A protein has these predicted regions:
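Active-site lid/adjacent beta-loop-alpha segment flanking the redox-cofactor pocket in flavoenzymes
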Residues: 95-186
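Central helical "cap/lid" subdomain
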Residues: 52-101
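C-terminal catalytic lobe of FAD-dependent flavoproteins
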Residues: 151-247
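N-terminal Rossmann-like dinucleotide/flavin-binding domain of flavoprotein oxidoreductases
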Residues: 17-29
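Single conserved hydrophobic/aromatic residue that forms the stacking wall/gate
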Residues: 1-12
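General small-molecule cofactor/ligand-binding pocket signal
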Residues: 30-32, 162
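A conserved short coil-to-beta-strand element within the FAD-binding core of flavoproteins
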Residues: 33-46
């Protein structure tokens, strides 16, 4: 029924983040920008606070939710996680008149496209395929992604690309996230969302808040625990992880 898809579209991610930040600020949450975490204070297996570039912050509970930087901070806690960090690129074209009012995805070709409110065609797809913390990628991946785009929309060949950029993704080994407690009392983990975490922001935040406040996982994230990688109870997500078992 075509009526079921009416009203669907894309969301400007920065505006969503700003909306959450504004509401959090109104509720008394301190948001400290340009503040790098440099270490953690752990005493007798309990978290006592964090060390930052702008001073120490004492806390009985700490939530680690830093996407592609997860392994960097985990190493400071002597934790080894089943996470790999990869670069994911995107690009935008010169603006054109409105022609797409939603998002089109090409699963087999690993390509997606939408149109911004300024008229640019926003496109992306595959990971760069190697481990990196650099927030930039290589041209061959963009060429590969746009080849898939041309298969869907040949007119794209006549457009100029304005810019490309990259972000670092925390890729779990089975393609599913981790929302759980850790072996350190008071330290909680939310990571492994790969390249699809934005759309899950509301439920991710809600279940993570419950896990921190109650010191126990919620029913909704009970299967997203860290120990599934040691027990073998991995989640079947169509091989959306990093595919490290493929030679």
């Amino acid at each position: 029924d075509s009526s079921e898809s009416r009203g669907l579209g894309d969301v400007y991610k920065r505006q969503v983040a700003w909306g959450y930040a504004r509401q959090a600020d109104d509720m008394g949450v301190d948001i400290i920008q340009h503040c790098e975490v440099t270490g953690f204070d752990v005493v007798n297996g309990k978290i006592k606070g964090i060390r930052t570039s702008r001073g120490d912050i004492k806390a009985k509970k700490v939530g680690l939710c830093v996407a592609g930087s997860t392994n960097i901070l985990a190493e400071k806690l002597n934790m080894t996680l089943p996470i790999e960090t990869h670069v994911l690129q995107a690009c935008v074209s010169e603006p054109v008149k409105p022609l797409l009012d939603g998002v089109v995805t090409f699963g087999a070709g690993h390509f997606y496209i939408s149109q911004s409110d300024k008229g640019e065609m926003v496109m992306g797809g595959d990971l760069d395929g190697y481990n990196s913390y650099a927030q930039r990628g290589n041209l061959p991946t963009i060429q590969h992604v746009l080849t898939g785009g041309l298969a869907l929309f040949p007119f794209l060949s006549r457009l100029k690309m304005l810019r490309t950029w990259g972000g670092i993704m925390d890729m779990s080994m089975d393609g599913s996230p981790i929302i759980d407690k850790t072996h350190i009392e008071g330290l909680y983990l939310n990571c492994g969302w790969c390249y699809g975490g934005f759309k899950s922001t509301p439920v991710s935040g809600w279940t993570f808040a419950h896990t921190i406040a109650q010191d126990q996982v919620h029913e909704l994230n009970s299967e997203l625990r860290l120990n599934r990688f040691s027990t073998g109870h991995l989640l079947d997500e169509k091989g959306l992880g990093t595919k490290t078992w493929i030679g």
